[in-house]
Amino acid sequence: MINIHKRNIVLLVGPSGVGKGTIEKILFESKTLKLSLSRSATTRKKREGEINGIHYFFISKEEFESKIENDEFMEWNEHFDNYYGTLLSEILLIFSQGRIPVLEVETYGAKKILQKYKDKKDFNWITIFVDPPSFEELENRIIKRGTDTKEKIAIRMAKAKEELKDRDLFEFKITNHTPEQAAEEIEKIILKKTMG
């Protein structure tokens, strides 16, 4: 049985395009794990089909900056002229529901969270870095999405190269050959770290 009193938090880390979102969809279907995705707050405009409070918490830049000043974020970052951040209140809400929060963050955000909370015994961190099968495959996945210009793809790839250098900062590393295989490996890691 999963020990919910440990206040486990899963940090799922990896470069953009590595498949974290697809892996999460599989993990959230698990009857064994009681996972909930921590929704981030953002100042970016809502995309078609997105719902406030479901996909993100869409807030104004002023409100976001006020939350920064009040130390309401576990971490926050500016990405392509928009703020993104993980609200501590969202994590506490997930705990109150008897579930394990999953934070899908880039390396920079993960490092900020771990720096801020590493000496606090409040949380049991399960840090997992998702690797692409190869750098070329990562680029192919980003291109196939069809959502970015060549310039944005180049920026994402340069950022991914930097993020891959930090992979050893995380306790577990898995390679996403297929989302099913990666999700199975991650489920085993989470079960091992949360039992007892």
From Swiss-Prot:
User: Which GO molecular-function terms appear in the entry?
Assistant: ATP binding; guanylate kinase activity
**Which residue ranges run through the membrane?**
none
Q: Which HAMAP family match?
A: Guanylate_kinase
State a GO cellular component annotated for this protein: cytosol
Primary location recorded for the protein, binned into one broad class: cytoplasm
General function of this protein: Essential for recycling GMP and indirectly, cGMP.
Q: Which gene encodes it?
A: gmk
Entry keyword set: ATP-binding, Cytoplasm, Kinase, Nucleotide-binding, Transferase
Q: Which organism is it from?
A: Mycoplasmopsis pulmonis (strain UAB CTIP)
Quote the catalytic activity from the record: GMP + ATP = GDP + ADP
EC class, as a word, reads transferase
The Guanylate kinase-like domain covers: 7-191
User: Record's PROSITE patterns?
Assistant: GUANYLATE_KINASE_1, GUANYLATE_KINASE_2
Q: What is the lineage of its organism?
A: Bacteria, Bacillati, Mycoplasmatota, Mycoplasmoidales, Metamycoplasmataceae
Q: Where in the cell is it found?
A: Cytoplasm
SUPFAM superfamilies in the cross-refs: P-loop containing nucleoside triphosphate hydrolases (SSF52540)
Under Enzyme Commission nomenclature, its number is 2.7.4.8
Residues where ATP binds: 14-21
List the protein's name: Guanylate kinase
InterPro entries from the xrefs?
Answer: GK/Ca_channel_bsu, Guanylate_kin-like_dom, Guanylate_kinase, Guanylate_kinase_CS, P-loop_NTPase
Keyword Transferase present in the record's keywords: the answer is yes
**Source taxon at top rank:** Bacteria
Q: Which Pfam families match?
A: Guanylate_kin
Q: Which family does it belong to?
A: Belongs to the guanylate kinase family.
